[in-house]
């Protein structure tokens, strides 16, 4: 009986010890794993920030080139100063020439338009915009060319397309300090979103084996004061529906803060993330990894220790039963 009691106590002690050791091992291993994940996220965020800056500076140069093109200015003034009934002739030689000039820099734009000083579209590479009203305040950001590279731009939901939008309007002068109208550029935010696209898990640029998968995305507040993606995520359906997003990281970033931490993402999943406010676009860049993925190796290690302890516990219990059975076996005469 004493032998059986010893083996049972040993079994319980082994199981309890392995449980404590596995939990402590898991918790101790989590710290370095979280630090490693954050270090990796900082590198990723810096790279994506640099790519966004490079993309934007390229577009700023293209807009500057357009505004300094004598042919563009000449054709624009011809349209802006024309009589109302002749402005809307989209097949006129002037309109076709202007469209050809602007199309050369169309890569990052949804459209390029000419606006009167009152905000009426009198020319556009998007013919559906003709004669539409595009306010020069609240939504479209009206500014001078030297201000374009660093001025925060308004982010809003386009009432026609329902898509998040950023539009800039730069003056075209008929004389010093005398505006004839504006060149308005509607940016293609999908191209901006492409700058922070994460590599496919099967590509050569994917995170190395053992590293947690990273999700990067850009969000901004619309004119309805709701946070949303700036463009449909990659591989989303054609009729993608933008939904409000909310998390501690999103709120802090859109309030102009940058930092890192542990929080629930918009889907309620625990993540470790780093967030950065991008003042140029009034946008937040977030780089996150699921805690489940980050802690996978420490969880596996803890489970292995617990399983080993459980096996030892069962072995001890089995030994106790075997010894007890042997001691209680009747002695043959």
Regions found by a protein language model. Name each.
Residues 2-16, 303-309, 323-324:
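Alpha-helical transmembrane segments and their helix-membrane boundary motifs
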Residues 6-10, 14-88, 103-110, 164-168:
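Juxtamembrane extracytoplasmic/periplasmic/luminal helical "stalk" adjacent to the first N-terminal
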Residues 63, 124, 181-182, 284:
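Short glycine-/small-residue motifs
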Residues 74-76, 119-126, 225-233, 274-275:
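Amphipathic coiled-coil signal-relay and dimerization helices
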Residues 85-99, 124-157, 198, 202, ...:
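Extracytoplasmic/periplasmic sensor domains and loops in membrane signaling proteins
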Residues 87-108, 127-129, 137-140, 166, ...:
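Solvent-exposed, extracytoplasmic
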Residues 172-181, 221-223, 234-304:
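Extracellular/periplasmic juxtamembrane segments that couple receptor/chemosensory ectodomains to their
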Residues 284-286, 291-332:
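Cytoplasm-proximal transmembrane signaling helix
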